[in-house]
């Protein structure tokens, strides 16, 4: 059954020609955070203060980002979520319960999407979705349509030529897009790198992905603060990013709005 889903995935998506909406001389980047806290499946030690330090760092350089947040985190730490948004960052869904879609039943998937559709979250203007562990499943398509999502995100690893996809009209998702993430911080977990190594790890993506394309770099807040060297390397990367005049940074939602207006 799973192999059937993988075949369907290959047939579902069509590459978008970014065309006149995006300057071919600039690289279009989005920064995203999977905000999971104790619901990540790992032992974590992160506070609201740690999270605020991240958003303040981004704000210092006038960067905005997209935070894909677990619904249970939204319920338990509402002040933290509001604070993230107050700095101009976008809020997206990382499922309600950090559900691994490819390991779940269809009933579990539908129940999770329904739980995330809580009235408590309505004013957060959530339009995007990112599957935990990047384990997306085609069975989520009907939920995308039913709950009004405008984009999703998947780590493709297509470092040099990230592709932005659209969903075909027959799925009631003709105005929905899929963004490509090229790298995240997961490979840094349990490593013993120096801060400059961490900075280089992230910055290599900036040099490789092509102008005229949209690409994402992802982070887990709990992982960033789990090791001082990782944190300092992340800070170094953000500082370096601020010097790159060839890179435009927007939220996923901002890119989606531009793209859906040109499909």
Segments from the language model and where they lie:
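Short, glycine/charged-enriched secondary-structure capping and boundary segments
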Residues: 45-47, 81-83, 107, 143-145, ...
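C-terminal domain-boundary segment and adjacent tail
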Residues: 56-66, 203-263
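Active-site-adjacent pocket scaffolds in enzyme catalytic domains
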Residues: 3-17, 123-213
